[in-house]
């Protein structure tokens, strides 16, 4: 990465502040401002007419930790989590590493595109031990964008 060369040295106070922050060792998002929550909730309200409470939200900086958090919060150990295969392999880790079972509903390849097998999906989701489905949209790796239809 390139930055402009300055005509003068950086102030000692700035250098020290950078050293102190670097010594902390955590470089991700450590503070989530209230404005972020308001913007997120406002977007859902404006776009879909759906109101939510701030307490319902869990801020995550990446998809994989978010999926693992969702699996832990919405299921209990030993329950099944359904995924439509082929699917991003990290989903399997998020399920198994949290003590849950993988339930696969393979996608069908028809007419040059992947399709959901709704009969298989319904059968597997009717199992009382299958308590969560991870819907990947757009689907990775098949690239399919699922529509309401």
Locate each region found by the language model.
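Short acidic capping loops at alpha-helix termini that bridge into adjacent secondary structure
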Residues: 52-57, 77-80, 129
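N-terminal small-domain helix-loop-helix segment of the aminotransferase-like
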Residues: 2-62, 69
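Short beta->alpha connector loops at strand-helix junctions that form conserved
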Residues: 85, 104-109
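Glycine/Thr-rich phosphate-binding loops of Rossmann-like dinucleotide-binding domains
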Residues: 9, 67, 91-92, 142-143
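A short helix-loop-beta submotif of the ANL/AMP-binding
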Residues: 97-103
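Active-site phosphate-binding strand-loop segment of PLP-dependent enzymes
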Residues: 107-149
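Conserved PLP-anchoring active-site segment centered on the Schiff-base-forming lysine
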Residues: 73-95
